[in-house]
Amino acid sequence: STFGACRLCTVEDDRGRLFASCSEEPRDGMVIYTHTERLRKHRKLIVELLLAAHCRDCTTCVKSGECKLQELAHNMGVLKVRYENYNEIRPVDYSSPAIVRDPNKCSCLF
């Protein structure tokens, strides 16, 4: 089953209902809108909230310039984050020789 936590795939049906497309099965006769003004505003807000919960060390991050979240924020016109980050800084997990897991970079894993 799909968790649908990020909500970036939110779509709108012909009744005005917003829902995550990744967690809804298509049905015959469904009318789905993917690029309405309402959806653009909604997705922009979601990106701002993701950034608010995200560690803000972008300029020193190894993914800077290649970060999908940075790219998404830029493409959506998010120039600043209007919300405070209230998450505590958690330790980075270097226990694997192949993977560095930084829980401060992904709000969906805690």
Predicted feature residues:
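Short, surface-exposed loop/turn segments at secondary-structure boundaries that line and modulate
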Residues: 4
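Fe-S ferredoxin-like electron-transfer domains
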Residues: 7-110
